[in-house]
Amino acid sequence: MAEADAAFVRSLVIYADSSLIAFNKPSGLPVQTRNRDDQTLDRLMAAFARSNGKRPRLVHRLDAQTSGVIIAAQTQPAAAALSKAFADREAQKTYLALVSGPAPEAAEGEIAHELARYAARPGLELMRAARPGDQHAQSALTRWRRLASAGGLHLLEIRPLTGRMHQIRVHLSLNGWPILGDPYYGGAGGLASGGRVRLMLHAAHLSLPHPGRAGRVCLEAPAPDDFLAVLSAAGLPAPADLVSGPG
């Protein structure tokens, strides 16, 4: 591995111990791809390989254009415990999302549309609201809270209670609030001032049972500069003092 790549992935570390390592993944870095030439977070785990060749194993995913906290297990027992925590819905996740659309009528709420996958084109699967008769409809529940609004844009705190593919993105779109910068679910446009923006979805907090000791580990990934710059351009406050984190 090139030293520059190793230095890059080490700069993303926000927490590490003998059981797990956590990163603040930037937008645009895929977790995994089928293309062997792509730089991915999974391939960058080689920077942490031990003398026996074993390296940390990622135990969950973020969409390539979503930034924020993501964790890898340092050992096989830790990988099993962390994977079980996600499967058993013991992981509490909090995201930030900048959406466009009508102002929320309440301060907070829930979205509970069932979802189903569909092939948008060869090689691209997306999600939609499930229809009567869909054999593989998946229940999905997302909680939201409005943090701030300005000029038809709304900064929301999002807590998904299930972990479906693209759940937050499609749920918000179905509720009339596409995430800014989302080309698949209605938010492809940028700010009124011009220019496209990144997908404005950031995984800010993650709390789950620690795989190597009693209690939980609570991780925080500060919103990156490219996310904060869009908020500033939209006239919205930085989220540091607005988000309560998982509880």
Explain the meaning of each model-derived region.
Residues 1-247:
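RNA pseudouridine synthases
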